[in-house]
Amino acid sequence: MAGCRGSVCCCCRWCCCCGERESRTPEELTILGETQEEEDEILPRKDYESLDYDRCINDPYLEVLETMDNKKGRRYEAVKWMVVFAIGVCTGLVGLFVDFSVRLFTQLKFGVVQTSVEECSQKGCLALSLLELLGFNLTFVFLASLLVLIEPVAAGSGIPEIKCYLNGVKVPGIVRLRTLLCKVFGVLFSVSGGLFVGKEGPMIHSGAVVGAGLPQFQSISLRKIQFNFPYFRSDRDKRDFVSAGAAAGVAAAFGAPIGGTLFSLEEGSSFWNQGLTWKVLFCSMSATFTLNFFRSGIQFGSWGSFQLPGLLNFGEFKCSDSDKKCHLWTAMDLGFFVVMGVIGGLLGATFNCLNKRLAKYRMRNVHPKPKLVRVLESLLVSLVTTVVVFVASMVLGECRQMSSTSQTGNGSFQLQVTSEDVNSTIKAFFCPNDTYNDMATLFFNSQESAILQLFHQDGTFSPVTLALFFILYFLLACWTFGTSVPSGLFVPSLLCGAAFGRLVANVLKSYIGLGHLYSGTFALIGAAAFLGGVVRMTISLTVILIESTNEITYGLPIMVTLMVAKWTGDLFNKGIYDVHIGLRGVPLLEWETDVEMDKLRASDIMEPNLTYVYPHTRIQSLVSILRTTVHHAFPVVTENRGNEKEFMKGNQLISNNIKFKKSSILTRAGEQRKRGQSMKSYPSSELRNVCDEHVASEEPAEKEDLLQQMLERRYTPYPNLYPDQSPSEDWTMEERFRPLTFHGLVLRSQLVTLLVRGVCYSESQSSASQPRLSYAEMAEDYPRYPDIHDLDLTLLNPRMIVDVTPYMNPSPFTVSPNTHVSQVFNLFRTMGLRHLPVVNAVGEIVGIITRHNLTNEFLQARLRQHYQTL
């Protein structure tokens, strides 16, 4: 068995020799490395913790509700709206800082290099120009990579991590202030360093961090700065603000508030309502107009004109006045757009496949090595990218005659060109007077300027240049995404796709004779096709692109192209963000399960090996349970016995638990008496028996299936009260799986808080003497609750008793063992649950379900077992 545990059985992952896997908990499966594909088996996986999106309605929370009236409710709602507005404004200011810094560094770099190239073209010292460009790029990339060493979670775009967070997975450090600082400064250095990355993706992460941290008014990174702000101290509230912040990030990046709202809905949040929709849209609007206000004032000096809605502006698409037959697009063009969507889906699937292999190589060979290796890899990517850009511009670029269109652009494009200096958009590197280098015009401009060139400058790029640019950019962008620098993928994908679309337009014009088609439209459709093939978003991306173009007539072709690209790409692999989520082993829950999973029931996927606590438990037992398990919640149970009165006489602790059990049993007669209706027709002895007797008698048990039986045996009751009577190998199956009446759930964080604050009572006293904590005191340490291993045991009396009933959740969501998996999945995902108890018909807990039991890989394993038992 040891051999099976230490290695992975590749030929028969679920065969008899690996039978031990079937008894492992979902946490063990995650730690030991179960993956969906055999080729991914060597990749490490991590036991991610879930977030508490379900509200715990315990006694402290009920006390808060009792003090709540309409006035306080309106005040709470008003504070939430103000916080949402502040999140939008702060996200817009973050975008303004990133954009201003990138422009400053990029203009400085290109200005120095362009002057050097112009001088060295005649003197023959181009190697010096290359060294200057390398000096700038390597310095910026080195700084970006160093920031990732400080906070590794700042690497990449952050969209996969935020998607996981909104799905209910706690990714360590993802919404910390230090992460925000490293992400913001890192992305401006990586973009300024000439890497083929974008700043729009990290803006989504930055907005999410602002949304998570601003309502707390405190930070782990700045522990001394604390405010007594009593609101929003739960994962449930933080999730809503993170959704708003992520949407604000999209809105600030693209000037698309509606698209940002739909992005947060489509890619992130598992729970949504009308009130949250309004707040998210308001937050997105606040971010968009904050950024627009300051950018318009800084760049044009016209404060309040609102001319630049986002970091990326596509400009207005408009045919030239001289071409009367030109149309933005016609019905005949839809056929070409569908074909481009298919090609974009294939290219996106290829991009994702190559990037996945690179990511797996990094996880095997780069990440296990010293952190300096990651910095060296980033510098290597920067070195190769810089050399390729410089050499391609010098060798592969064509010198083309500068036309009036190239010099000034059309009227719709004039505003954008003027804001960035007309002379900087057309590069004459290595070309004589009155000509320009088309390859250098794409490579030696910012990515946003290059996209605008492809969208609006007609006839400025040859097909050979576009093809070479696409190939080089495709390969280098694929290599760059995943390195240890903050990096986005939206703009590189748009630029790569725009080059592909312009290439298609040039071919149709030159070889098919469609001289009146608008090249900018094909560039936009190509950008949408490639981006859709990479990220596989449809609804939100359609709206984002429409808002960015400010042209509603593009709605149909963009939507058709994105749908075709997604369907084509899905035939081969998942979107790039889902690929990276899968490689990291995050237990992400999709929108729904496969149809065949309905063959399984809750009893097939639940974990029957339970670690539980009693309503009244000694501190010694609680500490033992907390220190020997990694579970984050424990069922609160009492044992189901018929001879309970025998044990109530000699043990006060057992007596307290049995009394709680009897008081918690609700009967129809007891409820009727509570409501004050007349019960005089019932004899008092009969009424007493009805109120106190057990809910139902148990049927004879079958020997074949002990896991689903709840039998009564003559064993010692409540063994978990005494650590020396904890489950042992000598116990029978009946003793291990004894019948347990379910009363509620208590979280690990709640138990540790009770121990830290000394909430307990002596056995000689009544449980009413136990100190009580308020809701504010229970949530004071949120989100960093104390750890049980940091607890000083010398300060605790192990014989003291803790009454957990006031602090447990007495009414969590539960399911029957016969509930189909699709119903379990929908309940778990839509309600944002962390634990789902499985309770039988007589109120006894028989198992518990976590998100690890609902992952696709776990369900596939259980489905294979189901087929084997048929």
From Swiss-Prot:
It comes from the Eukaryota. A motif (Selectivity filter part_2) lies at residues 198-202. The keyword ATP-binding applies. Residues 1-80, 573-870 are cytoplasmic. The modification Phosphoserine is found at S774. A motif (Selectivity filter part_3) lies at residues 488-492. A motif (Selectivity filter part_1) lies at residues 156-160. The record marks E267 as: Mediates proton transfer from the protein to the inner aqueous phase. Detected in whole brain and in hippocampus neurons (at protein level). Detected in brain, trigeminus, dorsal root ganglion, spinal cord, eye, kidney, testis, skeletal muscle, thymus and pancreas. Isoform ClC-6c is expressed only in kidney. Glycans are attached at N410, N423, N433. It is a multi-pass membrane protein. The keyword Thylakoid does not apply. Residues 159-166, 241-253, 257-265, 520-534, 535-537, 538-549, 550-553 dip into the membrane without crossing it. One of its GO terms (cellular component) is late endosome membrane. Keywords: Antiport, ATP-binding, CBS domain, Chloride, Endosome, Glycoprotein, Ion transport, Membrane, Nucleotide-binding, Phosphoprotein, Repeat, Transmembrane, Transmembrane helix, Transport. It catalyses: 2 chloride(in) + H(+)(out) = 2 chloride(out) + H(+)(in). Chloride binds at S157, F490, Y577. Disruption phenotype: Reduced pain sensitivity and moderate behavioral abnormalities, but have normal fertility and are generally not very different from wild-type. Voltage-gated channel mediating the exchange of chloride ions against protons. Functions as antiporter and contributes to the acidification of the late endosome lumen. The CLC channel family contains both chloride channels and proton-coupled anion transporters that exchange chloride or another anion for protons. The presence of conserved gating glutamate residues is typical for family members that function as antiporters. This is H(+)/Cl(-) exchange transporter 6.
